[in-house]
Amino acid sequence: MTPGYPLALSLAVSMAVLGSALPAQARQDDPSLFNRQARGELSEYGGARRVEQDLTQALKQSLSKKKAKNVILLIGDGMGDSEITVARNYARGAGGYFKGIDALPLTGQYTHYSLHKDSGLPDYVTDSAASATAWSTGVKSYNGAIGVDIHEQPHRNLLELAKLNGKATGNVSTAELQDATPAALLAHVTARKCYGPEATSKQCPSNALENGGAGSITEQWLKTRPDVVLGGGAATFAETAKAGRYAGKTLRAQAEARGYRIVENLDELKAVRRANQKQPLIGLFAPGNMPVRWLGPTATYHGNLNQPAVSCEANPKRTADIPTLAQMTSKAIELLKDNPNGFFLQVEGASIDKQDHAANPCGQIGETVDLDEAVQKALAFAKADGETLVIVTADHAHSSQIIPPETAAPGLTQLLTTKDGAPLAISYGNSEESSQEHTGTQLRIAAYGPQAANVTGLTDQTDLFFTIRRALNLRD
């Protein structure tokens, strides 16, 4: 299936004709919608093709315009089409596919950009804060903004709306939970690094509690009170509140006083049987960002020419007591589904971006594989449940490119040996600084479940807010 406008038109017609003709739970999805493995030997006639039959009827039957009870939004931070292709080629082979990321039947592309704070003109390369603000609130903002517009005014986000409508809420990330993507659902601050009271006093003084503001990201998170929040960022909880009811207490002590349950390893997470407004759950599994899955050398100048091809290795720091993204996703779903009104859950694979910044292809690939496994968990639940919309996308594109192995590229390069046994050269060349940069290329967005057709064709990142709000029938 090729994403694009003709498909969007045909889907609109199909929606009008079929609507929700079949109850979602009774529908048997055609397996050919999800299996995109190459059908034979790549060297044979038709061997590389991924589709063997006409899928028109299968696509029609997959459509539903009914409201969703639940939404699971999965974000690959920095996961542009190039990052997906790099990871697929290495981990699954040229004819392989990701059973999560590549298996959602309805696909589109969306534009993403931020705005200059002073002029309101487009800034064509967004950061993660402005992008998360865009899909969580429906408002474009400046780079660094968390839940506020270019005038620094807060806007209600999807998690707040879901709570207002009686739904359970969850937020999962492999980053510090105060990082931009998860933070946009937890707080409203004028600068993205205002994790705790110390940084907020210096960087976001108007938000600081001692100045009459709503507080740091972590302090606002504790007030927002999502049912389940899992990831890294434990270090910030050692900071002390400067004002308010909990002045002089650490943020961890405040969380405990507010009735939160805090877990710190996989066994403790597995032991949790319920999480709700009476006792919300916080999982803090690392002081900062959680350890990545795979390690390998960072790219170097002419690394593809001067260094041998390598294979990625498991990260020994990601020990068995640290939950994976898939395990956190499964547990969040298990806990949130108990709410009879449904739930909204955001899941982020955060370090695709962070490893791209570091020009580390193995790190980037492992995090994409991790996200795919989380998507598989979400899809499995949605297929069994029949009332869940699953959406997979990214916040911005990034810097990795696949180049011919023998190319003398001007940037940083690394040669890998793929599952096929073939050389794969990855290049990072958009910055002479220590960190590679985001790019402004439009992004893939794909979906499965009720109202999934609304992601097809060309949309904008802010459309995602309205797509989810409409699907869940969220009201102010």
Swiss-Prot record:
SUPFAM superfamilies reported for this sequence: Alkaline phosphatase-like (SSF53649)
InterPro entries in alphabetical order: Alkaline_phosphatase, Alkaline_phosphatase_AS, Alkaline_phosphatase_core_sf
Pfam families according to UniProt: Alk_phosphatase (PF00245)
EC number(s) per entry: 3.1.3.1
A GO MF term: alkaline phosphatase activity
Positions contributing to Mg(2+) binding: D77, D179, T181, Q346
Domain of life of the organism encoding this protein: Bacteria
Binding site for Zn(2+) 1: D353, H357, H438
Matches recorded under PROSITE patterns: ALKALINE_PHOSPHATASE
SMART domains: alkPPc (SM00098)
Signal sequence segment: 1-26
Keyword Secreted assigned: yes
Cellular component, GO, one term: extracellular region
Enzyme class (EC, first level): hydrolase
Cofactor: how and how many bound: Binds 1 Mg(2+) ion per subunit.
Keyword terms of this UniProt record: Hydrolase, Magnesium, Metal-binding, Periplasm, Phosphoprotein, Secreted, Signal, Zinc
Cofactor: Mg(2+); Zn(2+)
Any one Gene Ontology BP term: protein transport by the Sec complex
Active site residues of this protein: S128 (phosphoserine intermediate)
UniProt: Zn(2+) 2 binding residues: D77, D395, H396
Reactions mediated catalytically: a phosphate monoester + H2O = an alcohol + phosphate
Family statement: Belongs to the alkaline phosphatase family.
Cited function: Has only phosphomonoesterase activity.
PANTHER family with a match to the protein in the record: ALKALINE PHOSPHATASE
Protein known as: Alkaline phosphatase H
